[in-house]
Amino acid sequence: MARVKGGVVSRKRRKRILKLAKGYYGAKHILFRTAKEQVMNSYYYAYRDRRQKKRDFRKLWITRINAAARMNGLSYSQLMHGLKLAEIEVNRKMLADLAVNDAAAFTALADAAKAKLGK
């Protein structure tokens, strides 16, 4: 029997990796071994950063809410506590959006929180 070297399968595998490495800088999109390493790292970064993105956005929202709350004479923690006492359930994403795009509505929420805090 003739020896089968698996050329078609190997070429397909290498081609798939090099296609995934398209756009990478330098040898990382040309050489199979370095491309494979970079693609593996890319999968790791993508997995890690999908989780990191959630933390980053929460941080951003809290920063925006804090800035708007301080313009209304409250700290972030006081505002959140006041809203909880007033039984106003608005998540941080919506609060941050109000702080940026609708200052009047945010001020109304801040006033409701102040009233419950007794300020």
From Swiss-Prot:
Gene3D superfamilies: 6.10.160.10, Ribosomal protein L20. Binds directly to 23S ribosomal RNA and is necessary for the in vitro assembly process of the 50S ribosomal subunit. It is not involved in the protein synthesizing functions of that subunit. It comes from the Bacteria. GO terms for molecular function: rRNA binding; structural constituent of ribosome. Keywords: Ribonucleoprotein, Ribosomal protein, RNA-binding, rRNA-binding. It comes from Streptococcus equi subsp. zooepidemicus (strain MGCS10565). It holds the Pfam family Ribosomal_L20. The lineage of its organism: Bacteria, Bacillati, Bacillota, Bacilli, Lactobacillales. PANTHER family: 39S RIBOSOMAL PROTEIN L20. This is Large ribosomal subunit protein bL20. One of its GO terms (biological process) is ribosomal large subunit assembly. Belongs to the bacterial ribosomal protein bL20 family. GO terms for cellular component: ribonucleoprotein complex; ribosome.
